Regions:
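ATP-dependent phospho-/nucleotidyl transfer catalytic cores
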Residues: 120-232, 243
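Short helix/strand-bridging catalytic loops that position acidic/His residues to coordinate divalent metals
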Residues: 67-73, 122-131, 249-257, 263, ...
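Conserved NTP-binding catalytic cores of kinases and kinase-like/nucleotidyltransferase enzymes
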Residues: 1-108, 116, 244, 411-432
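Regulatory N- and C-terminal appendages and interdomain linkers associated
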Residues: 1-37, 53, 154-157, 327-432
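A glycine-centered beta->alpha junction motif in the catalytic cores
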Residues: 61-68, 112-130, 148-149, 270-281, ...
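Active-site acidic catalytic loop and adjacent metal/ATP-binding pocket
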Residues: 36-51, 56-58, 216-262
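Conserved ATP-binding subdomain of kinase catalytic cores across diverse folds
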Residues: 45, 50-175, 310-317
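Active-site activation/catalytic loop segments of kinase-like enzymes and analogous catalytic loops
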Residues: 84, 261-337, 359-375
Length: 432
């Protein structure tokens, strides 16, 4: 759809029309509406329609990958999954998810809440050097509530299996993820690109390292087979809008049941990419602030997740009406404080190393694969950009390998310390 057809659509839809027109609009005159295409993503069109009564967003899923073209087809059914994910995530975390007003499956068109300025895409805010004081805590809370609430820690086995079956139908979007994150960066692929010639040797090492490819393949296996919770599926800083006071998570069209660490790692990776980019943009002081937010985000997530888990166990023990006793680590089995503590520690350790691994493969793919991040791409000096990218690749490959050995960087504070070492060190000449 284009701007003209979008306006016609809104005017002919009672729900949407009511949201943008005011009672004082003169029915004898052309409706005072404006439309602007604002999407800067890789696969959709996004329009803002404004009138005297308010603003709404209309998002249309294209039948191909926008950043590649019609040669790469993509299912429009993803819009259905996006709507369902927004509804579920808003149920669990209403303060951080926009409202869906309308969905037209035949056109793959979603009408939703307009998130007004000063909110802006978080990636752009970080590139501009803004210091939003609450976004890290908000995103940690979003992860805790949505991952716990859709997992076997909160649901019974029958319910979870039904949900896994339902969300497994979003297989086309999962297949895209599998290709661009777990496969393409490790082979010769026409869609891959990198800063050349500065990163030629680095990209070659990634494609030739058997150890790295094995670790990435094991992470891919977990992505394919581990159905822990309903994931956003593409939770980067471009899928978040934020301001001084508010944060919203948007664009969950890749949603599926998968390993929790994939969503956690997605945010860690994007904040780390932002961190390394600051050497060529906003400087060391702001870089340190970004790294501090990375720590806050994960600490908030871990604390919130464990509190939800502990509260669920307390309610199950007290037989609170309506309280769920999750199938995994049932209260009747883990009936002492020590057993709960051990169970939680083991679970969170595995989740942490999963998160590191998924963060690593995402960092790698954003530098030598398809669909790079503006944090780095907008550094116009190729030598400065490649210096930042080399540091990010060094840490990214370390994280992928650590996810399998589970030796070192056992908490987010240690991750931050290692990131500081890489940031402050000389420009890496190799990944080994």
């Amino acid at each position: 759809m284009d701007a003209t057809s979008i306006l016609d659509y809104v005017l002919n839809n009672t729900t949407l029309r009511r949201l943008v027109l005011s009672d004082g609009d003169d029915a004898s005159q052309p409706p005072p509406l404006s439309v602007k295409e604002v999407g800067d993503g890789n696969i959709n069109f996004v329009f803002v329609v404004s009138g005297n009564g308010g603003c709404i967003v209309l998002k249309q899923a294209l039948p191909f990958v926008r950043c590649v073209g019609e040669s790469w087809p993509l299912t429009q059914q993803r819009a259905t999954f996006e709507v369902n994910a927004l509804v579920e995530q808003r149920r669990l975390c209403p303060e951080l998810v926009p409202i869906v007003y309308h969905f037209d499956a035949s056109k793959a068109l979603i009408g939703m809440q307009f998130i007004a300025p000063p909110n802006m895409i978080l990636r752009r805010a970080l590139m501009a050097g803004h210091r939003y004081p609450h976004f890290a805590q908000h995103l940690g809370t979003f992860l805790a509530k949505t991952l716990f609430g859709t997992s076997l820690l909160a649901l019974d086995g029958v319910t979870l299996r039904a949900k896994v079956a339902e969300w497994s139908a979003n297989s086309a979007m999962c297949a895209l993820t599998e290709k661009v994150i777990f496969d393409d960066p490790y082979i010769e692929c026409r869609h891959n690109r990198w800063t050349s010639p500065q990163l030629d040797a680095f990209s070659g090492l990634i494609r030739s390292s058997t150890e790295l490819k094995v670790a990435a393949a094991l992470l891919k296996g977990k992505f394919l087979s581990c159905t822990q919770a309903l994931l956003h599926g593409d939770l980067h800083t471009g899928s978040v809008m934020a301001s001084e006071k508010t944060t919203y998570v948007i664009d969950p069209e890749f949603a599926f049941y998968g390993p929790m660490g994939f969503d956690v790692g997605a945010l860690l990776s994007n904040l780390l990419l932002s961190y390394f980019s600051q050497a060529a943009t906003n400087g060391a002081d702001y870089a340190e602030w970004v790294l501090e937010q990375t720590v806050i985000l994960h600490q908030t997530f871990a604390a919130g997740f464990l509190e939800l888990w502990s509260e669920s166990l307390r309610q199950a023990e007290a037989s609170v009406a309506g309280a769920g006793d999750g199938e995994h680590f049932k209260a009747a089995v883990f009936d002492t404080a020590r057993s709960v503590e051990r169970a939680q520690a083991a679970f969170m350790q595995n989740l942490w190393y999963d998160s590191l691994g998924f963060a690593g493969v995402k960092m790698i793919r954003r530098i030598v694969g398809l669909a790079h991040v503006a944090d780095l791409e907008d550094i116009h000096d190729a030598d400065k950009r490649s210096d930042c990218e080399k540091r990010a690749l060094l840490l990214g490959t370390e994280l992928v390998l650590l996810s399998q050995s589970q030796q070192g960087l056992s908490c987010v504070l240690q991750l931050a310390d290692r990131a500081r070492q890489v940031y402050a060190g000389s420009t890496p000449q190799s990944l080994v």
